[in-house]
């Protein structure tokens, strides 16, 4: 017997109602589950998903997590009374975030002193802009600032070194090779002069991984060993790296949520081609296996325990600073520059 038009209408209505009901239930469950996933463990709304830990973090818990890791790197021996820490500050995100975190970690430590060192290499249109960011930051957070100029210290700006083709005459391939050595020399010199117990450098986890893998690929065993060494005493101020366990992405995010203004433009002399390619390789590995950056660092630190190579440290005959030969690299360059000029 055929259904009447009335019965067919009722059946169609019931079918539509059932479909509608299931769709609403599915949508409700999806929204509810999504909401549940996007909550931080503290109950607040999450704003960041940390893939390698499989955690959703709210802004406050994210901030605490970053500072906890920096504190873990430093340890109780460094976070203590009557300590003086020099901070190498450039105006970029890493150094300013590092300075901000150190300010937070030491704000309740009696007689702890922080002093920032800003090295002005003399790069027009770049370093003068960075200096403005640094001065504003140090003023806002009441940090002592000492500005160190290449021109005052070695008699030349980096612009002059490059413009006059002194690099090729010194048998130096890139401006970064010259600049990096001189910067480290000057930071150590002034940290020592100011009586600092430690010198903080803003290398993040990505920087570590890139340098480690670049040295592996190039087979540069000497650099692999020296990169992990922490020289101290006898003319060296021990270097500390509070951002060692913090990925670059999270350094940027920390700067954003704390409204830290920093210089975003890269140095015009920076040569990022090889490092940039290595960065891409690490990003691919991290995407496929979250946490691989930490694995690279841990593996390297384990390897260092087996590379117990002792290098004889001498004193430079000119400046008195520690070096491996009779004259340190900076003094040997300055001698050659005088001969060239």
From Swiss-Prot:
Its EC number is 2.8.1.-. [4Fe-4S] cluster binds at residues 176, 179, 267. GO terms for molecular function: 4 iron, 4 sulfur cluster binding; ATP binding; metal ion binding; transferase activity; tRNA binding. InterPro entries: CTU1-like_ATP-bd, Ncs6/Tuc1/Ctu1, Rossmann-like_a/b/a_fold, TilS/TtcA_N, tRNA_thiolation_TtcA_Ctu1, TtuA-like_LIM_N, UPF0021_CS. Binds 1 [4Fe-4S] cluster per subunit. The cluster is chelated by three Cys residues. Its cofactor is [4Fe-4S] cluster; Mg(2+). Keywords: 4Fe-4S, ATP-binding, Iron, Iron-sulfur, Magnesium, Metal-binding, Nucleotide-binding, Transferase, Zinc. PROSITE patterns: UPF0021. GO terms for biological process: tRNA wobble position uridine thiolation. GO terms for cellular component: cytosolic tRNA wobble base thiouridylase complex. ATP binds at residues 88, 183, 202. The keyword Magnesium applies. It holds the Pfam family ATP_bind_3. Zn(2+) 1 binds at residues 40, 42, 58, 61. Zn(2+) 2 binds at residues 316, 319, 328, 331. Belongs to the TtcA family. This is Probable sulfurtransferase.
